Amino acid sequence: LAKHFTLIAWDQRGAGLAYSKKEAKNLTLTKELYVEDAHNIVLWAKEKFNKDKIIIVGHSFGSVLGVWLAEKYPEDILAYVGVGQCVDYIRNEDLSYAWTLEKAEELGDKKALKVLQKISPPKNGMYKENHRKSIIKQRAILHKYGGANYSSRKPYWQELLFHELPIMLKEYSVLQIIKYIKGVSYSPN
C-alpha cells in the first residue's frame, strides 16, 4: 500500500502508542469518542493532502470503527476497506466466550473455568464488570487454547517478542515500544 498511497497509521485512544497512563485512569472510551477522533484525523488528512475524500482501511476493531465512521460521515469517505472485518461484534463476543468456556470444560481447566465464571458471559458485547479487564482475561484463555489464531499456540508475549518486536524496532524507539505494550494491555481492541 505504501508504494501507491500515503498511509496514516493511527492508534485510537488508549491503544498502542496512543496509551497514556493519566488518560487511562480518567477516560471513558465510547463509540462516539472513537468516531469523532477518527473523523478529526480524516478532516486533517483532507486538508493536509488537499483531497475531497479519503480512503479508510480498518483492521480488527478498526474495522468496526471504519464502518461507524463511513456510516456517520459518508461525505468524507471515498472508500472503506475492512481487513479482518468484524461483522457482528456482539455475536462475536458471545461466540468467543462460549467457545472458550466449552474448551475449558472439555480440557478440565479448573483455573480457566473459575476465571470465565467470574467474569460471566458478555451482554450486548460487553462484560458487566470492568469490561477491559474481563476481555483481556477472556482473550488470554482464548489464545491459550488457540482460538485467536489456531495455527499458533504461543502466548501473546512470545508472538510480540519474536514476531512483532523485530518489525517494530525498525520504526519505533524502545520507549515507544514500551508505550505500545502498555497500550495493548489497556485497550481491549
Where are these regions (language model features)?
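Conserved alpha/beta-hydrolase
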Residues: 1-20
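Structured segments of extracytoplasmic/periplasmic soluble domains
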Residues: 4, 41-48, 72, 83, ...
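Cap/lid segment of the alpha/beta-hydrolase catalytic domain
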Residues: 14-32
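Short, solvent-exposed loop/turn and secondary-structure capping segments
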Residues: 18-22, 68-69, 91-95, 171
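Conserved acidic catalytic loop of the alpha/beta-hydrolase fold
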Residues: 33-53
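Conserved hydrolase catalytic core segment
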Residues: 52-91
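A catalytic-pocket lid/entrance helix-loop region that shapes and gates access to the active site
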Residues: 75-123
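Alpha/beta-hydrolase
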Residues: 107-189
